[in-house]
Amino acid sequence: RRHTRLQGDWSSDVCSSDLEHCLRVAHAAGGSGVLIVVGQGGDGPEAEIVERCRNEMKKVLPLAASLGQPILVENVWNRMMYDHDKPPEQGPERFIDFVDSFKSPWVGMYYDIGNHWKYGQPKEWIRKFGHRCVKLDIKGFSRKKDAFVDITSADDDVPWGEVREALAEIGFAGWATAEVGGGDVARLTTVRKQMEKALYG
């Protein structure tokens, strides 16, 4: 994973050389993509942040293609490409515009379902992302509690049935990652069962 800032050092902007390094490491390790987060809303005007990120990403697209490593944008709570303090019926159009601006199959979405259940309907985001949706992050979220919770727990109000329907509609066949706390074999077995319930019903 790679943000548009150096991991662990939010005072330093990431440049194309950082992305190049991540692409090469992902390829060497047998990975299938590099995750990026497009800036922080507090860094300045969104348009300027987006343009800086776009310019750096464009420099490494030929390398991404040659290595077979897509650059995947994740939706996080970074006050970018959504309205952080507004109601939940928001759409993914700004993410789509950013991805489409590259006109490249090597830029897509790493859609975090739990992150933006607070802000929009997952079924609509998935349908609109369509082929752009390359990978998924899975975690539970409670709108009522305004907090992350265990996947498919009693408090998790993510509409997983609608998520499954939308993923089937777009023919999603990519990786899904449980972005939750780990643990021993028992804990990981529980997480696996939670993911199966979320994605298979």
Describe each PLM feature range.
Residues 12, 39, 148-150:
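Vicinal oxygen chelate
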Residues 44-57, 64, 82-88:
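Active-site cleft segment of glycoside hydrolase catalytic domains centered on the general acid/base Glu
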Residues 66, 70, 98-101:
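Active-site region of glycoside hydrolase catalytic domains
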Residues 11-12, 17, 81-89:
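Conserved glycine-rich "GG(E/T)P / GGGxP" loop and the immediately following alpha-helix
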